Amino acid sequence: MSETNPNQTKPPATGYQSTEEMVAAQGAYESDALSRAQADLAELQAKSAELADQYLRAKAEADNARRRAEDEISKARKFAVEAFAESLLPVADSLEAGLIIKDATIDHLREGTQATLRQLLAALERNKVIPINPQPGTTKFDPHQHQAISVVPSEFDANIVVTVLQKGYAIADRVLRPALVTVAAPK
């Protein structure tokens, strides 16, 4: 077997005819592996950059959503107060109109006051402000809704509301002002 014969077969173990071919093939293989590794690295770097960009966009979107939510809450508070104040304007108008009348009789004043009170109660009701008005003799004292001014001897059972000195008010199950009451003393 001569190395110069082109028809000569390669040795089966290595498949190379010479050491130079083997070194060249290994160099090509290493070069190919390096090229593949560099291509994989470039692909991973591109994917990493894409994910970093997606993260930054998602973070910016979350920040914007948080800012919008804070703005909406601020506006809702402002407009809630605005709507409540607007519902009280007719009451103020009625009071001012009543004060303008110079020769009003007691009956006129009472009638105007009752009409104004109805307007005020309607405005409170529209804004979900409900009265806390316990029924004397039947309502049990509730420290969450009532404030006991005194404990008095009574024919009622202990801890029953005897009199209501001032109604209380609540909004959305939150007490704005407790009802001022007297409570029956234990017997």
UniProtKB/Swiss-Prot annotation:
It is found in: Cytoplasm. It comes from the Bacteria. One of its GO terms (biological process) is protein folding. GO terms for molecular function: adenyl-nucleotide exchange factor activity; protein homodimerization activity; protein-folding chaperone binding; unfolded protein binding. The keyword Cytoplasm applies. Keywords: Chaperone, Cytoplasm, Stress response. Gene3D superfamilies: 3.90.20.20, Head domain of nucleotide exchange factor GrpE. Coiled coil: none annotated. Homodimer. Participates actively in the response to hyperosmotic and heat shock by preventing the aggregation of stress-denatured proteins, in association with DnaK and GrpE. It is the nucleotide exchange factor for DnaK and may function as a thermosensor. Unfolded proteins bind initially to DnaJ; upon interaction with the DnaJ-bound protein, DnaK hydrolyzes its bound ATP, resulting in the formation of a stable complex. GrpE releases ADP from DnaK; ATP binding to DnaK triggers the release of the substrate protein, thus completing the reaction cycle. This is Protein GrpE. It comes from Albidiferax ferrireducens (strain ATCC BAA-621 / DSM 15236 / T118). The gene is grpE.
